[in-house]
Regions:
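Hydrophobic, Leu/Ile/Phe/Ala-enriched alpha-helical segments that form helix-helix packing faces
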Residues: 11-15, 19, 93-96, 137-140
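Metal-dependent nuclease catalytic regions and adjoining charged, substrate-binding loops involved
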Residues: 68, 79-81, 95-193
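A residue-level signal for conserved active-site and pocket-lining positions in enzyme catalytic cores
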Residues: 8, 92, 179
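Short, charged, amphipathic alpha-helix that recurs within catalytic cores of restriction-modification
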Residues: 73-95
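Metal-dependent nuclease catalytic cores that hydrolyze phosphodiester bonds in DNA/RNA
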Residues: 1-55, 62-69, 175
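A generic fold-level signal
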Residues: 37-39, 84, 171
Length: 193
């Protein structure tokens, strides 16, 4: 997370140097969702003379993520958002009673910056993602136990000379590999180096 924090500081300095009006950088926020008071801290609010104030999230990204996910825009992220960036952005915006502006994304290898703008008409998305967040909070706060983890492992597949070869091994779902609770869901998993 240190790289991400440093990237956020650099972006804020660049915005200030470019005379872009900002407010509430790294401000605490809270929202009652799913019957719980969920707290966080948003990255920044940009005050655009045309669009007004909107909540933006700053992301540091690998070159792959920068070019293959964020560069394709908001709609592409809706199709594949394993880390919940859309839920996160709409939660921060809702906590301030504002629209979600989108992401300011920095390629942490090259330093390139891109703005990935959320659509102006976002009420349907807002409702959808706030609903997903409420469901997740309610599930986490209940006394449920998994009959099986919510995300299932994937078959390991190698491609050799254009032919797919399945090894018979299972791999954790991509979302699970980054999760701090993976050992709870997958206590018998073995990590090979």
């Amino acid at each position: 997370f240190l790289i991400g924090d440093l990237v956020e500081c650099a972006v804020m300095a660049i915005l200030k140097g470019a005379d872009i009006k900002t407010s509430d950088a790294q401000s605490k926020c809270a929202l009652n969702i799913g019957g719980e008071n969920v707290k966080g801290s948003l990255d920044i609010i940009l005050d655009d003379p045309v669009d007004g104030k909107k909540v933006w999230d700053i992301k540091s990204a690998s070159p792959y993520s920068y070019n293959m996910k964020f560069a394709k825009g908001y709609e592409a992220l809706k199709e594949d958002d394993p880390f919940g960036y859309l839920v996160q952005g709409h939660l921060y915006a809702e906590s301030k009673g504002m629209d979600f502006g989108g992401w300011i994304v920095v390629d942490k290898s090259s330093g390139e910056i891109q703005f990935v703008k959320a659509p102006d008409d976002q009420e349907e998305d807002r409702e959808k993602y706030l609903g997903k967040a409420a469901e997740a909070v309610e599930a986490l706060m209940s006394n449920f136990t998994f009959k099986k983890p919510p995300l299932q492992p994937e078959d390991e597949c190698l491609t050799v000379k254009g032919e797919k070869i399945y090894t018979g091994n299972k791999l954790l779902n991509k979302q699970c590999t980054f999760c701090g609770y993976k050992k709870y869901c997958w206590p018998k998993a073995i990590q090979y180096d």
